[in-house]
Regions:
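Non-catalytic interaction/Regulatory regions outside core domains
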Residues: 1-119
Length: 119
């Protein structure tokens, strides 16, 4: 699956992007691109998978429809978590001071392209 070009385009299009990773349901990296350390990006991807799993359980218990995206904002960074399918998800990390709206727009575009590659 050619994920690297899609992830590269995502990171290049989002000002302040530090990295993007596609991981499977176990939190294992399928592919990743970033200016941050590869190991750190893999750890972030795995941890955000745990958050995604927990949020999916909450959404299911509430009887709501499927979870589309999660945004985590800290003092220094923002992280976007988006499911691609039931088994794969995208994590995008970026600087806190940069444009979250642009990041969400580009991540949604990337999700559509990733979905086409996976399904």
């Amino acid at each position: 699956m050619p994920f690297r070009p899609l992830l590269t385009a995502l990171v290049e299009r989002v000002p302040g992007a530090q990295g993007a990773i596609v991981a499977d349901w176990e939190g294992e990296s399928v592919d990743q691109v970033g200016i941050m350390d590869d190991y750190d990006l893999k750890v972030i991807g795995a941890h955000k998978g745990v958050i995604l799993h927990s949020m999916r359980e909450v959404v299911d218990r509430l009887g709501d429809d499927e979870l589309k995206e999660i945004v985590i904002t800290t003092k220094q960074a923002q992280t976007v978590i988006m499911p691609v399918t039931e088994d794969y998800y995208l994590v995008l990390t970026l600087d806190r001071s940069d444009m979250l709206g642009r990041a969400l727009l580009e991540a949604r575009r990337c999700i559509q392209a990733l979905y086409k590659e996976i399904v």
